[in-house]
Amino acid sequence: MAKAYLEPEEIAQMEKAAEYLRDKLLVRLLFRLGCRVSEVLGLRVEDIDFRQGTITIQHLKTRIQLACPQCQARLGKQHKFCPRCGITVEQAVSQAREQQRYRRLPVDKEALGLLKEYLDRGGAVSKPGKKLVFNLSRHRAWQIVRDLAIKAGLPKLVIAESGKAHNVSPHRLRDAFAVHAVKLNDSGDSLRLLQEHMGHKNITTTMKYRKVSGEEQKEWYASLWKGEEKDG
């Protein structure tokens, strides 16, 4: 049967299927933190606070902005004329701008214990100016997650936007975290906290997990029969 997201029990099966501590830790952090794969792979040893039980996530995002070639005013994709200087814009100038954001996330004791064991075994790797927890490329991380899901006997997941089934990927573990959180509590306050935890700029992005989890439809359906419950 086609599924849209993973259950915590299925992710636990992936961890059990891991032969190496590194791979088990990768799956654990992707799910328990609900982070982007780039954030987990960019995790530094100094970002971990074992005493407070938190991890500081650095999110570096490069955004491409379009600008007028004459006055450098910002343009939208559909702009044919510059709103500032009025010239006809045949080819806008592309400018890459980096945005760096930080957020501090709580970590459960089991994940912290796994992290400590991994670091005690010398798992971290030193790079110029920093000590990374993982020495993995995005592609290699994707391969590890895919292979562990297959080894655990998990099905492919259906992507809602396309309706097509795909192998389990790191982002599906992030999705699983969000859906799990929404299924436990989908109140307004909980969704706001989830938005902050996930690093979503817009609450609309967070709200999509209510639809994926089925909670939104369940509430709607239950509301259709409220009168009958009172009559009974």
Predicted segments with their positions:
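Short, charged phosphate-coordinating catalytic segments
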Residues: 30-52
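Short, basic (Lys/Arg/His-rich) helix/loop patches that form interaction surfaces
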Residues: 123-129, 143-196
